[in-house]
């Protein structure tokens, strides 16, 4: 038994419990570190025998050793649970564990031999209902993803509405991650009520035209240091309407969400926090100093691993898409869309002029005050994959080909080309070493969605393109079913083969 933060280590002094046998074939623990919490263990058979030595110390964890820490931990083991079985026989035994507030102590009875099997069957029934609702039939890959999606949907206490967790076990709900994952977790699974609640949750927290970057674990006010979460919000709203599209859905968007979208457009056009503003060329500038406001946001003290201050390519691709989405909504609601259409036209002209890298046949990553960053990164893929884009067909194809050739890495997409002098192919070692690699070559699973969407677009959704896209998904499927946290997709992978899974487990 342990009781600690996910990445912490425990000593004997950290693991102090009130521990007593209970009446249901097990024992009850109350942690000294959280006296309002109760942990109950019960068993359908066997007897408890107190252990003379109640602590297993110096347990070594390989992942922590790889990260250049001692990797030693301690577990509290108050009892041995012993069973007597006849030779050459088998039996079914149920072990149950519950965690609840002390004041909510449930009425427990000793479990039967098949209690655990019954509980597992109830969970399976729930998962089966999710699969049936999603409607993918006997597609095992899709059904596994439907079940995996469920673990990230949670209810936020501050709003009483649904939100999306960015990853398990250590990420809370992040605005950017929520909006990127929104379509896959709620629309592709046909959880439309959850989708609506998630849009409402983040609409309530828009501040100075900015969707929260993250909600802290301890319930403090949200943080807003992001330039892209607000623009991804338009993508989520547009996707919601394209899948649902009922008059009641448009009514909901018009009343609850559309005013927020206009607020965001106004804030970005006239300037808001974190040096986010529209420049004279209608492109969005974001970030300054130590502020990291794109998804490549590693900062340790005064060290910024991937400074992208200026006009990042994906921010401006999202900006154009947001203007087009708002214009379409204005027209649907019988309002004047000309201000959004005219601004989108200016953005498109400036984007094609400033971002196209003729030499490399792709897009610059950032337009900086002192030049243009020609690093080949995956951010440019969104200038092709988003619903509203600005490139010619030939330019879009070249972007996809560049990402395919330079960045595709097994189940993910590299964050930087291996040809770059700052490329790091292995995400391992001490925290500074890992931070240096996080966005400098490490491959990311979520980027595969944007790449495959762009790939299908430039190849006109042909049967050949679909076949190739499924081939690109094969490493994802293998990882999902055989590697890491089985049934989930890891946050990141080494940029170098064999692309070992790293980071957040799900």
Enumerate the language-model features and the residues they cover.
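Acidic, mature catalytic/reactive cores of soluble proteins
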Residues: 1-506
């Amino acid at each position: 038994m342990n009781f600690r933060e996910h990445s912490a280590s425990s000593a004997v002094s950290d693991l102090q419990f009130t521990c007593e046998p209970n009446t249901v074939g097990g024992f009850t623990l109350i942690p000294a570190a959280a006296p309002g919490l109760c942990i109950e263990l019960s068993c359908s058979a066997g007897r408890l025998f107190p252990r003379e030595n109640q602590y297993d110390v110096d347990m070594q964890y390989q992942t922590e050793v790889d990260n250049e820490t001692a990797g030693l931990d301690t577990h509290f083991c108050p009892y041995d649970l012993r069973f007597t079985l006849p030779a050459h026989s088998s039996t079914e035994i149920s072990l149950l564990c519950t965690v609840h507030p002390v004041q909510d102590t449930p009425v427990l009875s000793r479990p039967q031999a098949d209690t655990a099997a019954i509980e597992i069957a109830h969970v399976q029934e729930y998962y089966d209902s999710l699969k049936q609702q999603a409607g993918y039939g006997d597609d095992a890959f899709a059904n596994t993803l439907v079940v995996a999606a469920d673990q990230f949907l949670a209810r936020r206490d501050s709003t009483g509405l649904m939100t999306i967790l960015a990853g398990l076990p250590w990420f809370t709900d992040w605005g950017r991650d929520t909006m990127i994952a929104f379509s896959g977790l709620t629309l592709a699974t046909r959880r439309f009520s959850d989708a609506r609640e998630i849009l409402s949750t983040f609409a309530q927290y828009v501040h100075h035209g900015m969707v929260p970057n993250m909600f802290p674990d301890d319930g403090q006010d949200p943080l807003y240091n992001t330039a892209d979460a607000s623009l991804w919000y338009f993508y989520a709203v547009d996707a919601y309407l394209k899948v649902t599209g009922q008059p009641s859905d448009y009514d909901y968007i018009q009343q609850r969400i559309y005013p927020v979208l206009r607020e965001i457009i106004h804030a970005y056009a006239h300037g808001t926090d974190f040096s986010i503003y529209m420049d004279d060329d209608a492109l969005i500038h974001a970030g300054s100093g130590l502020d990291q406001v794109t998804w490549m946001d590693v900062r340790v003290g005064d060290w910024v691993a991937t400074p992208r201050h200026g006009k990042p390519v994906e921010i401006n691709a999202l900006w154009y898409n947001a203007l087009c989405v708002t214009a379409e909504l204005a027209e649907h609601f019988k309002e004047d869309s000309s201000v959004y259409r005219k601004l989108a036209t200016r953005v498109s002209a400036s984007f094609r002029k400033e971002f196209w890298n003729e030499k490399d046949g792709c897009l610059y990553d950032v337009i900086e005050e002192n030049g243009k960053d020609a690093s080949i990164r995956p951010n440019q893929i969104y200038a092709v994959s988003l619903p509203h884009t600005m490139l010619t067909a030939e330019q879009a194809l070249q972007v996809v080909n560049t990402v395919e050739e330079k960045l595709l890495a097994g189940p993910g997409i590299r964050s930087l080309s291996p040809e770059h002098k700052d490329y790091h192919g292995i995400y391992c070692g001490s925290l500074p070493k890992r931070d240096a690699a996080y966005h400098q070559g490490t491959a990311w699973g979520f980027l595969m969605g944007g790449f495959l969407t762009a790939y299908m677009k430039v190849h006109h959704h042909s049967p050949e393109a679909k076949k190739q896209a499924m081939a690109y998904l094969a490493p994802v499927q293998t990882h999902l079913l055989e590697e890491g946290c089985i049934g989930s997709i890891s946050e990141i992978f080494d940029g170098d083969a064999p692309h070992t899974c790293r980071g957040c487990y799900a």
